[in-house]
Amino acid sequence: LRKRALWFVGVLGLTASAIWADDKINVLVWDEQQPVPKKVYANFPGNYIVDHLKKNPRLNVASANINQPEQGLSIKALDESDVLIYWGHVRHRDISEAKSQEIVDRVKAGKLGFVVLHSAHWSVPFMVAMQEVAAEDALEQLPENLRAQVDVRYKGELGWNMPKPDA
């Protein structure tokens, strides 16, 4: 509980610092850009988010999508971002676990904020992030002197038990 409270205070501190910082915050808005949302958002949801965020003079905002080289999530793009806003709808398995781990490693190192929108809670990056949280939670159950001796591993592949579209 203390660790989570410290994390929360840390996030609040980073947020407050960003608000008053002289430097702009670099935001990468990622969108899977598949056809269904285009029926509602002619220019895709991610681009609407980008257009809105660009109104804030404290933000440098870039758009990326799954159809770009390296699925819009190149090392360079991630390194140049302070925050990744990830909009997903149905192409949740199209980002590899390796790429997802790159995102999560940056989040854990405090180099990248990660905001998951719409149904991206089914995405591989979010699921890998939740595995990391589960591993940390499991280790916290052990006495501190034993934690370094334990290697948490996951058996099998990520599972998708998504509800049916009409549920």
Specify the residue positions occupied by each region the protein language model found.
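N-terminal secretory signal peptides that target proteins for export/translocation
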Residues: 1-3
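A glycine-rich, often tryptophan-bearing local segment used as a flexible ligand/cofactor-contacting loop or short
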Residues: 91-167
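A cross-family glycoside hydrolase active-site/sugar-binding cleft signature
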Residues: 64, 87, 117
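Bacterial N-terminal signal peptides
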Residues: 7-17
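The substrate-binding groove and active-site-proximal loops of carbohydrate-active enzymes
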Residues: 36, 85-94
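A generic local structural motif
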Residues: 15, 70-73, 100-102
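Aromatic-Pro/Gly-enriched surface loop or interdomain linker
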Residues: 20-81
